[in-house]
UniProtKB/Swiss-Prot annotation:
It comes from the Eukaryota. Its main location: nucleus. Involved in the small subunit (SSU) processome assembly and function, and in the 18S rRNA synthesis. Required for the early cleavages at sites A0, A1 and A2. Residues 96-186 form the RRM domain. It comes from Debaryomyces hansenii (strain ATCC 36239 / CBS 767 / BCRC 21394 / JCM 1990 / NBRC 0083 / IGC 2968) (Yeast). GO terms for biological process: endonucleolytic cleavage in 5'-ETS of tricistronic rRNA transcript (SSU-rRNA, 5.8S rRNA, LSU-rRNA); endonucleolytic cleavage in ITS1 to separate SSU-rRNA from 5.8S rRNA and LSU-rRNA from tricistronic rRNA transcript (SSU-rRNA, 5.8S rRNA, LSU-rRNA); endonucleolytic cleavage to generate mature 5'-end of SSU-rRNA from (SSU-rRNA, 5.8S rRNA, LSU-rRNA); small-subunit processome assembly. This is Pre-rRNA-processing protein ESF2. It is found in: Nucleus, Nucleolus. The gene is ESF2. Residues 258-267, 284-296 have a biased composition (Basic and acidic residues).
Length: 303
């Protein structure tokens, strides 16, 4: 009996322990859920704070851009002093320009700059691209899609470097590594004596002005032709309508116009006779004034 009571006590203790463990686990789960909720709420708060910071930053950036634009408008360009102007003119006099009449196919400006910079420092470089018609035709028939340049100009800081570059590269291979794409290509380059970069810009501006003038003249001629064509069409419509009305009237009146030829519709305008008071004019054109009867009566009484 004593053993049975002890077993029952142990069983009750085990049940109590199990209940305690269940309560502990439930409380653990609840604490985990609460922690998760707290973390979510903290994350939401952080996100809201970040959004507020972003909005604040965007407002600050907008204000800064507005202020910068205002400052840029208010900035007045300072005039060069005579000393600075003289230095700039000396720099321009030292520069030399080379003309490239033939450029290797599909060579980019960066590659050309790296090739020519072996002879000296390069300031400006301009390459003339090919026409759009030739490019589209080449691509249409399965050609290369890269850009191709037909001519170019290069400005060296020192004219001695420009002369050296033109003397060594003109009509010769580019060379370099045999595996390079432009190893066997030939460049035609010429040094332009007494030619500066602003001369090139002036020439391009003149060409653009001439092109614009030609285009405007062609447009005006085309507009005149269109106007004359429209006027002729309107006149022909008007004449056709007049002829149709005349035919309708004649059909109503029952006149027989089978033998009569159709006369052209012309307007009869009243015109004054030509007259002239010049001495060398013809007698038919001279203006002959009618004699005044009252004046003749007075003169007859006097004399």
């Amino acid at each position: 009996m004593i053993q049975d009571e002890s077993d029952l006590d142990d069983f009750e203790d085990d049940e109590e322990d199990d209940e305690d463990e269940k309560v502990f686990n439930i409380s653990k789960k609840a604490s985990h859920i609460d922690n998760f909720k707290n973390e979510e709420s903290e994350d939401e708060e952080d996100l809201n704070e970040e959004d507020d910071d972003l909005f604040m930053n965007t407002d600050i950036i907008d204000e800064e851009t507005i202020e910068n634009s205002k400052q840029a408008k208010n900035i007045n360009l300072k005039k060069l002093t005579p000393e600075q102007l003289a230095k700039e003119q000396k720099k321009i006099k030292k520069t030399g320009v080379c003309y490239l009449s033939k450029i290797p196919p599909y060579m980019k400006p960066a590659k050309l700059r790296s090739v020519l910079s072996r002879f000296g420092k390069i300031d400006r470089l301009f390459l003339k691209p090919e026409d759009n018609s030739t490019y589209t035709k080449r691509v249409k028939y399965g050609g290369n899609k890269k850009k191709n340049y037909t001519a170019g100009w290069v400005e060296f800081i020192n004219k001695k470097d420009a002369k050296l570059c033109a003397g060594t590269l003109n009509g010769n291979k580019l060379g370099g590594k045999k595996s390079s794409y432009y190893y066997d290509d030939i460049i035609n380059i010429k040094y332009l004596s007494a030619f500066k970069w602003f001369d090139l810009t002036q020439q391009i501006a003149k060409e653009n002005e001439i092109r614009q003038a030609k285009l405007s003249m062609e447009l005006s001629q085309q507009q005149k032709l269109n106007k004359s064509f429209i006027n002729n069409v309107e006149k022909s419509k008007m004449i056709n309508n007049m002829q149709n009305k005349r035919k309708a009237r004649q059909a109503e009146s029952g006149a027989d116009n089978s033998n009569k030829e159709e006369s052209d519709i012309r307007r009869n305008l009243k015109q004054r006779k030509l007259a002239s008071t010049r001495a060398d004019a013809e007698d038919e054109l001279k203006h002959k004034s009618k004699p005044n009867e009252k004046l003749n009566d007075v003169l007859s009484k006097v004399f």
